[in-house]
Amino acid sequence: MLKNLDPLLSADVLHALASMGHGDEVVICDANFPADSVARATVLGKLLRLDGVDSARAIRAVLSVLPLDTFVDDPALRMEVVGEPNTIPAVQREAQAEVNAAEGRDVPFASIERFAFYERARKAYCVIATGEQRGYGCFVFKKGVLLAPDAPPQASAGNRS
């Protein structure tokens, strides 16, 4: 047993998240996503699972230990609804609330077309499948850095000189 870790995070998921470096990406996907075949093309090469939970709950667990990248404009991506790229379904609104809570600030999702999402997911470090049954519960997160207290302040994507 470990302290201060979300109990959803298995040893395999924790190892993958800890092994990721700055700029690596993790995919959190719904039960409709072709997770196994896509995961085989990733850096990790195998599928990770958080069965029995929805996407928002999985995001809460993952972002409890994974910082988002502040060096890029869009560290969080959502799969667009086919034919309706500006539609934000409930599953994505719930995920947005979890991202904002984890980061303590607004980090709006950028959207990505479905097939472009599949291609991006194949280049990710790993894929985590959830039990989310609603469509469009698929997201990509880019890992950031944690700096020591005495490190120089890092510029955010919108605040570079």
Where in this protein do the model-derived segments appear?
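A structural preference for long, well-packed, hydrophobic secondary-structure segments
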Residues: L2-G23, V65-V72, L77-P85, Q154
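Solvent-exposed alpha-helices and their adjacent loops that cap or buttress functional pockets
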Residues: L9, A18-M20, A39-R40, F71, ...
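Structural motif
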Residues: D24-V27, G45-L47, D69-M79, D106-A110, ...
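Long, charge-dense
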Residues: L50-D73
